[in-house]
Amino acid sequence: MDHKNYLNHVIRGIYNDFQFLVDEGVVERSALDWVHANIHLQDGPASPVTAPAAQPVESSVPLPLPKRKSSVEKRAGSVASAVAAMSLSQNSGEKRTPEEPRKLPGVPAPQKQSEASSVNSSTEKLPPPPSYPGPNTAHKNVERVLAMYDFPGPDAGDLGFHAGEVIIVLEHVNNDWWRGELNGKEGIFPSNYVRLLEDSAVKAQPPPPPPQQNYPPAASSSAPPMQYQQTAYPPQQAPYPPVQAYPQAPQQPIVVAQPTEHKHSSTFKKIGSGLGSAFVFGAGATAGADLVNSIF
């Protein structure tokens, strides 16, 4: 980068810084108009300031840095502070006509003693710039990039790294500068110095399952069944023997006597009744004796 391109690079940074201060309400827009009216870009063809394309890792020649970092990282510099002080003094009623700085190649315009003291006193009265909110760390996805070249990180807030290191991307500040983390350190780095890894979209891991409580194992079904103590009962008495059925005596045929034989008929009746009584008494006595013997 030659001297003219470097001056244009610094002037563009001043424009960006003052635009940020105007948006935050620190200075009036008239100060920004004064900067545009009095600080011009250098004439002549200027090389493009866009970020160059990334080269393979094997190349040892580092790429030129892209355009100036975000205005959040680099606030108003020495030249911006001087112009802001002059703008504030004009708004407070103190009219001054700034002199046109001499355009010397490689040498900035010198400041007078009174102007330097005025700048110091005015900068002390300026309110501090608002703090830049930190990156949102609650990412569902994490981007990882691979460093293609060595980046020393010359400025405060830069994230230095070496070629081959893996960086976690926290925020895309703009198209040219990203914010990342490496070895516990956060900072910004040029996006054309790194290459996005294919497996960078790593989803957040689900929370681990709750610890399981250890319960005693259930009793196996093959265990022997529980034995119950049976109550001993007194032995039962032997059942009574069944009563033997004795065959009945065949019924005697009834003889019908003729009416003429009256005497024989009555005799046969007496004999038949006697035999029946004897049979009944004998059968009953035998059954009764057997029943008494079985009981005792």
From Swiss-Prot:
Identification of the protein by name: Protein csh3
GO BP of this protein: actin cytoskeleton organization; endocytosis
Polar residues bias locations: 111-124
Alphabetical UniProt keywords: SH3 domain
Superkingdom: Eukaryota
Intrachain disulfide bonds: none
Comp. bias (Pro residues): 205-214
CC annotations in GO: cell cortex; cytoplasm; cytosol
The organism of origin for this protein: Schizosaccharomyces pombe (strain 972 / ATCC 24843)
